[in-house]
Design a protein with these regions (language model features):
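Short alpha-helical transmembrane interface motifs in multi-pass membrane proteins
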Residues: 66, 91-95, 143
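Hydrophobic (often cysteine-bearing) scaffold residues that line and stabilize catalytic clefts
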Residues: 37, 76, 106, 110
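Loop-to-helix transition at the N-terminal end of transmembrane alpha-helices
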Residues: 34-42
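Short hydrophobic/aromatic helix or loop-helix immediately within or flanking a transmembrane segment
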Residues: 61-89
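Extracytosolic helix-loop segments that constitute the early lumenal/periplasmic catalytic or substrate-binding loops
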Residues: 41-66
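Helix-to-loop transition at the C-terminal end of transmembrane segments
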Residues: 20-35
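Membrane-embedded helix bundles of polyisoprenyl
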Residues: 13-20, 85, 98-117, 121-166
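Start-transfer (signal-anchor) and selected internal transmembrane alpha helices
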Residues: 1-23
């Protein structure tokens, strides 16, 4: 029973973060400024399938001649999506699962960091506030900056790691 209660704060964080993920439950994909995310995941998969490691030039852009897309845009977020695609999910669902994992990871790491200073309740509140920050919603659901959004888990993880090193 004690083991179950040790996971309770993390489960509360996940439940409180779920409404931020509601736009991902709609069928298809949502409209945003940079709405080529699924195509980029498709091109990353095509590059990896052709053993272009690390993928730099994607084969389907540039009118079929290829385009050095991943020289200019960081591919980390798409590797997360590729993981889900290799598990058998389609490209659209893999992209949505990529966003879900980014949101949950950033909420979890913010909880770990804030718990050190504010306790469990403060960690939960900080985690939810970090998830619902308006900049994050604009970043994902308006701008479509998934590479930038994939950096959000690392900010509290970095500070938590530095605190733990002391």
């Amino acid at each position: 029973m004690k083991k179950i209660f040790s996971y309770l704060p993390f489960l509360m964080v996940i439940v409180l973060v779920l409404p931020a993920l509601l736009p991902l439950l709609n069928p298809g994909f949502f409209v945003m400024h940079d709405d080529e995310q699924v195509g980029r995941l498709f091109d990353l998969h095509a590059s990896l399938a052709a053993f272009h490691i690390p993928p730099r030039i994607v084969p389907n852009l540039g009118f079929g001649y290829g385009y050095p897309f991943f020289n200019f845009y960081p591919p980390f977020a798409y590797y997360i999506g590729e993981f889900f695609h290799l598990l058998g999910f389609g490209y659209i669902l893999s992209t949505k699962l990529m966003l879900v994992s980014i949101f949950i990871a950033s909420a979890y790491f913010m909880y770990l960091f804030a718990k050190q200073f504010l306790g469990k309740v403060g960690g939960i509140v900080s985690s939810v506030a970090y998830t619902y920050a308006s900049y994050r919603a604009i970043d994902v659901y308006v701008r479509g900056a998934f590479a930038e959004a994939s950096s959000f888990p690392f900010i509290p993880l970095l500070f938590w790691s530095l605190y733990k090193l002391q």
